């Protein structure tokens, strides 16, 4: 598992195209590759499979600092909780990571993350499901 941003993927692979970069990086060894694209979402690659999850459009963004790290923490936290490393579950983890990152940008610093409750996380995940019109089983 490797989680990097799009600029890191380009630098590591020497490719400008994210698809070509991902193919090269996967040949280096990771089974799964997540490429974060900031406010534009994230991509998951594994073998010949690709999944894209957009970021939730946020009207009030106060501080994007740390959102990528919060995404990675939410992603890995979901995987640790579910103990399932299938591609399907990785897609769910992308959505949970994106949901957590969306909370991060709502206030300056980590304050918002200290306030959220599980029901709010589930509601935000539901907003992602509605946004992309797919179901998480």
Whereabouts are the PLM-identified features?
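A short beta-strand/loop micro-motif in the catalytic core of glycosyltransferases
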Residues: 1-5
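Conserved phosphate-binding/catalytic region of the ribokinase-like
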Residues: 14-137
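A generic structural signal for short hydrophobic patches within well-formed alpha-helices
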Residues: 9-10
């Amino acid at each position: 598992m490797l989680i990097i941003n799009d600029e890191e993927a380009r630098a590591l692979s020497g490719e400008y195209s994210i698809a070509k970069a991902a193919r090269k990086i996967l040949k280096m060894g990771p089974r799964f590759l997540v490429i974060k694209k900031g406010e534009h979402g994230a991509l998951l690659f594994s073998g010949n499979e690709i999944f894209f999850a957009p970021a939730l459009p946020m009207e009030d963004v106060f501080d994007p600092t740390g959102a990528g790290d919060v995404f990675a923490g939410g992603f890995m936290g979901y995987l640790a909780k579910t103990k399932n490393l299938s591609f399907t579950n990785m897609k769910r983890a992308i959505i949970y990571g994106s949901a957590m990152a969306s909370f991060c940008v709502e206030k300056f610093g980590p304050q918002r993350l200290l306030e959220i409750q599980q029901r709010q996380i589930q509601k935000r995940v539901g907003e992602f499901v509605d946004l992309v019109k797919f179901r998480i089983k």
